[in-house]
Amino acid sequence: TLIFAQEKEGVSTSASMGSVTMDGKIYNQVAIRPEIPIGKLGLGLDVYVYFNDEGIYPGNWDFSDGNAFATLVDKIYYLRWGKPGDNLYFKVGALPSATLGQGILVNNYSNIMEYPQVRRVGLDFKMKFMKQFGVELIHSNFKKTAPGVLATRFSYDPFTRLSLGLSYVTDIDQNQGL
């Protein structure tokens, strides 16, 4: 997959091109992923088209059946509030790079390694309160009853440049990719 990205204040967009195997057939993929910021809220969309020599794959844009809502929700790449470093930050959906604390146990974790064949809905949550206390949570996939990666951290910052924390990280489904 080839990815183009452009970071700016305001609307940002990334795009990718690649190939995907669906229903035993190989399709080319073109995707555009704009992020639409509305104040602290950010909505990442995943607008994609699969095509081959027979034409466009219709399954991803068919709103006529009973799965119209699921088809529409599938176009949401992520929903975010704030930015990392804010007192309250969370991102629900695709997690291309999530870090817990200083990154000793979890650094740049991604739940999109098998994307777009497997679409996970994860959570990266960070909250600071009373300027000294913090809570962090990373959950890899809400679509499964048993999570894969689950990471939590509670921190206390007694001084500006010192943070003490208690972290717990587990991969409940560690053999999944083997």
Regions found by a protein language model. Give the residues of each.
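Membrane-embedded beta-strand positions in outer-membrane beta-barrel channels/transporters
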Residues: 29-33, 75-78, 122-124, 151-153
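Gram-negative (and chloroplast) outer-membrane scaffold detector with strong preference
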Residues: 73-89
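Signature for the C-terminal beta-barrel architecture of outer-membrane proteins
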Residues: 7-12, 25, 42, 55-57, ...
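Surface-exposed loop and membrane-interface regions of Gram-negative outer-membrane beta-barrel proteins
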Residues: 41-78, 105
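Hydrophobic h-region of N-terminal signal peptides that target proteins for export
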Residues: 1-5
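Short, solvent-exposed loop/edge-beta patches enriched in aromatic
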Residues: 34-43, 83-87
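Transmembrane beta-barrel strands of outer-membrane/channel proteins
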Residues: 15-19, 45-49, 94-96, 137-139, ...
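Short glycine/proline- and aromatic-enriched beta-strand/turn motifs that initiate or cap beta-hairpins
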Residues: 6-35
